[in-house]
Every structure is written in structure tokens, then in C-alpha cells.
Regions:
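NAD(P)+-binding Rossmann beta1-loop-alpha1 motif at the extreme N-terminus of oxidoreductases
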Residues: 1-36, 158
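Structural motif
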Residues: 5-10, 44-47, 70-72, 103-107, ...
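Internal alpha-helical scaffold of NAD(P)-dependent oxidoreductase catalytic cores
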Residues: 15, 21, 82-85, 97-175
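Conserved beta-strand termini and adjacent loop/short-helix elements that scaffold enzyme active sites
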Residues: 29-31, 92, 127-129
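Rossmann-like NAD(P)(H) cofactor-binding subdomain of soluble oxidoreductases
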Residues: 32-98
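Glycine-rich beta-alpha junction loops
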Residues: 72-74, 96, 131, 178-182
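Interdomain hinge/lid region at the active-site interface
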Residues: 154-221
Length: 221
């Protein structure tokens, strides 16, 4: 299957890489007008970028074309404009290395994503919309801790190389999941870990956001 990738979120690019390992042809899409050459479109964008991405490609998709987005913060409803144009729309957000939160509209798309996940050795999990934000906050916190642990273990020579699975540290989604971290009573830990990860991984936007949130004059909710 020929898959076009629009965007550069880490979650999306890691998902695309796994599809490529499974034998699919992956190509970065520079011009949406070229979409007719592809069987599927992967929107590798964060939740805050999703509406713009849908607008970018809407005029160029075709009926029965598979469209997948990979942000855990948004369900398949975010692709409604493409669904009305006849696309097979799917939300499929990787949660770690083995599972994937999916959201579909019918049995056809459920079967499509089920087959794709089988090919890339991932297990589908139907995640209720009302649980997305909380689950995202917990997962992003865990992945940030994992990144810190891996770097520390490498520096201490506990491990010889950085693990092959790079965590999906997408700044926009990490920041947008923060309200759930506040509700869960983990706001301070979330901010502290985000600041350290931003500094360690040289993700300036994430580091500066965390520093501002830590400032005593800020409303940290």
C-alpha cells in the first residue's frame, strides 16, 4: 500500500516507520494535490494542528481513500470533513510500543485498522472519548520519565545504546494534556519532568512552557 505522510509529529512518523517495516511504501507528501497517487494518508500532526491539516488536504482526497491521524487527544470525529468526502477515516494513536488507541465509525474502518495493526504487531484498544485526555496525560508523563531514565542509564553506562523505540514526545500534545494532569493531582511532577525533558532533548518550546508554568505568578491550572 502506498501511504502519504502529511506532517512531522513524532507519533505519526514512528507509526509511518512501522508501516514501512511491514512492507508498505511510505512517502512524505509535499503537495496535497498529489494525493491521488496514494492509497492512504497519514496525518502526522498534533491535536492542535489537526484542523489545519484536514483543511489542507480536504480538496484533494478521494472516496475510499484511507485517512489516519495519530494524536491521542482527538478521536475520529476530528476527520468528519474527510469522512463526508467518502474517505475511510480512522484515529489510531500509539500508546507505547505494543498498543494503539483506535476510534472508528464503522465495521469497515475497524477491520482496516485491525489488519494494519496486526501487520505492525500492535494491539488495538477502543478508548472512550471521555477518557482520552486523562489517558494522554498519564502516557505522556510516563514517556517523558522513560526518556529521562534512558538518557541517565546511557550516561551511567548501564546500557550501551539508546533504546530503539524513541518516545513520542510531541510538544503540542504534551502541553494540551496538562489540564488532565492538574485534575489528576500530578501537575507539579508533570511540569518538572516536562522541563527536564525539554532541556535534555533540546525541545525549547516544551522547556519554556514548563518554566513559565512553574513561575509563582502563573495560574498553574
Amino acid at each position: 500500500m502506498r501511504v502519504a505522510v502529511w506532517g512531522n509529529s513524532r507519533a505519526g512518523l514512528n507509526f509511518a516507520r512501522r508501516l514501512e517495516w511491514a512492507g508498505h511504501t511510505i512517502e512524505s507528501l509535499e503537495d496535497p494535490s498529489e494525493l491521488d497517487r496514494f492509497d492512504a494518508l497519514l496525518l502526522a500532526v498534533t491535536a492542535r494542528e489537526l484542523e489545519g491539516a484536514v483543511g489542507d488536504v480536504a480538496k484533494h482526497v478521494r472516496p475510499r481513500q484511507i485517512v489516519i491521524h495519530t494524536s491521542l487527544l482527538a478521536g475520529v470525529e476530528a476527520l468528519d470533513e474527510l469522512e463526508t468526502r467518502g474517505c475511510l477515516t480512522i484515529a489510531a494513536a500509539p500508546m507505547g510500543w505494543e498498543s494503539c488507541a483506535i476510534s472508528t465509525l464503522d465495521e469497515v474502518t475497524d477491520t482496516v485498522i485491525g489488519l494494519l495493526l496486526t501487520e505492525i504487531h500492535m494491539t488495538p484498544e477502543h478508548l472512550p472519548e471521555e477518557q482520552r485526555l486523562e489517558r494522554a496525560a498519564r502516557m505522556y508523563y510516563a514517556e517523558m520519565l522513560w526518556a529521562l531514565h534512558s538518557r541517565a542509564a546511557l550516561a551511567a553506562k548501564i546500557i550501551d545504546d539508546f533504546p530503539s523505540h524513541v518516545p513520542d514526545l510531541d510538544t503540542g500534545d504534551i502541553i494540551d494534556a496538562y489540564p488532565a494532569a492538574v485534575e489528576l493531582g500530578m501537575a507539579r511532577n508533570y511540569r518538572d519532568v516536562a522541563r527536564m525533558v525539554g532541556e535534555q532533548e533540546r525541545i525549547e518550546e516544551l522547556e519554556l512552557w514548563a518554566v513559565r508554568k512553574e513561575a509563582p505568578w502563573q495560574n498553574n491550572s
